């Protein structure tokens, strides 16, 4: 930037360094919403699988705006969220160096899809994970030991989290057999109530509508789509050099002065792009779809056409959404089938956008495999008429 007579911000943010591959495939919750002991006990996060995107039409509720009561078309993401199963509870104590886990109590019966998570190769293993621990629940001595650990949690711990896993076998579009295991913090009530609440959920299914509601703002944590090794122009957005540049033009011309005799970390360099851990905040829930209810279909108050939320031909590279789902405004991190962590928002929402009530008029169910024209197969058959097989 020598001899430049105007201000120019640098290309690319340094706030996301280092730009390297994420250490884990599943999004990690690094902060939970602030606890309020006066409220009843509740869970604060959930796991889902990204299915794909579609678009909706709705009326804007914004009094005073020119757009008030006008139709708008918006992109939405469908995240399939089958019920999670609670299998354990963890207690944390506060130390000068942060939270430290005191003890963990597991449920008696753990499914095979969860036990697969503790093996690198399930087929060649002895499949004995938790067999000794589950016998604790059958003997008097073991029950006393478990009860003493729970009492220790009530006495010393300040944070209680449950261990819950996804039901991966219900995800027919995924070939994976290992369930994803996650810690979910319990907020509300005192510590004793939290421990009792966690124990009451052991081996039970927790649906997504027990945590998130329609029109709520949530955060999405996940790992972005991987791009591999990329150059500086794609990775950092720096300007291409002139056409006649010697030895390449999609480069940084000068990577630093002679002294200091090293390359600064702030200089744009080629390297890994994508597969980064990211948190997207304030995504509005447009619909919570429940299996067996009208909300699972793409029907609305204005559009009574009987059609499923899955577009014609299924979501590309995913398939059919058969379980509960969340409809989120806008896009979300990761490719299709990627597991994403859904978390309640950290801050109290007061903006007009967050408080707006969403009334969907139309949900598109046309094929995503091209320029889809038809919402249902019956509509397509009616348009083309009777087909004659050769």
Swiss-Prot record:
Localization per record: Cytoplasm
Main subcellular location: cytoplasm
Keywords for this protein: Cytoplasm, Ribonucleoprotein, Ribosomal protein
Start-end of Basic residues biased regions: 18-31
Record keyword Ribonucleoprotein present: yes
GO annotation, biological process: translation
Cysteine pairings via disulfide bonds: none
One family name in Pfam for this protein: Ribosomal_L3
SUPFAM superfamilies tied to this protein: Translation proteins
Cellular component, GO annotation: cytosolic large ribosomal subunit; nucleus
Region (Disordered): 1-36
GO molecular function, one term: structural constituent of ribosome
Keyword Cytoplasm: yes
Family in the record: Belongs to the universal ribosomal protein uL3 family.
Name of the protein in its database record: Large ribosomal subunit protein uL3y
Species of provenance: Arabidopsis thaliana
């Amino acid at each position: 930037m020598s001899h430049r007579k105007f201000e120019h911000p640098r290309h690319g943010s340094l706030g996301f360094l280092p730009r390297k591959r994420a250490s884990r495939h599943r999004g990690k919750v690094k902060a939970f919403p602030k606890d309020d002991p006066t409220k009843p006990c509740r869970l604060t996060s959930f796991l889902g699988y990204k299915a794909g995107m579609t678009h909706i039409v709705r009326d804007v509720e914004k009094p005073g705006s020119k757009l008030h009561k006008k139709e708008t078309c918006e992109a939405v993401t469908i995240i399939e969220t089958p019920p999670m199963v609670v299998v354990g509870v963890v207690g944390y104590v506060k130390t000068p160096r942060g939270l430290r886990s005191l003890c963990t109590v597991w449920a008696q019966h753990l499914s095979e899809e969860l036990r697969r998570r503790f093996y690198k190769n399930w087929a060649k293993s002895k499949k004995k994970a938790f067999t000794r621990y589950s016998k604790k629940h059958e003997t008097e001595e073991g029950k006393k030991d478990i009860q003493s650990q729970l009492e220790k949690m009530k006495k010393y711990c300040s944070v209680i989290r449950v261990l819950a896993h996804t039901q991966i076998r219900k995800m027919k579009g995924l070939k994976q057999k290992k369930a994803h295991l996650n810690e979910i913090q319990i907020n509300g009530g005192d510590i004793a109530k939290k421990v009792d609440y966690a124990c009451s959920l052991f081996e039970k299914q927790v649906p997504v509508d027990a945590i998130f509601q329609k029109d709520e703002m949530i955060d999405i944590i996940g790992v972005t789509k991987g791009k591999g090794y990329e150059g500086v122009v794609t990775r950092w957005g720096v300007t291409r050099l002139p056409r006649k540049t010697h030895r390449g033009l999609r480069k940084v011309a000068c990577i630093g002065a002679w002294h200091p005799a090293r390359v600064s970390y702030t200089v744009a360099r080629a390297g890994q792009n994508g597969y980064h851990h990211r948190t997207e905040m304030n995504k509005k829930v447009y619909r919570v779809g429940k299996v067996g209810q009208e909300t699972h279909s793409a029907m609305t108050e204005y559009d009574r056409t009987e059609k499923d939320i899955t577009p014609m031909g299924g979501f590309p590279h995913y398939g059919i959404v058969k379980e509960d789902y969340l409809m989120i405004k806008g896009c979300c991190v990761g490719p299709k089938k990627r597991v994403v962590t859904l978390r309640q928002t950290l801050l109290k929402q007061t903006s007009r956008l967050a408080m707006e009530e969403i009334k969907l008029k139309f949900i598109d169910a046309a094929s995503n495999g091209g320029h889809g024209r038809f919402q249902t197969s019956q509509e397509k058959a009616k348009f083309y008429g009777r087909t004659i097989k050769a």
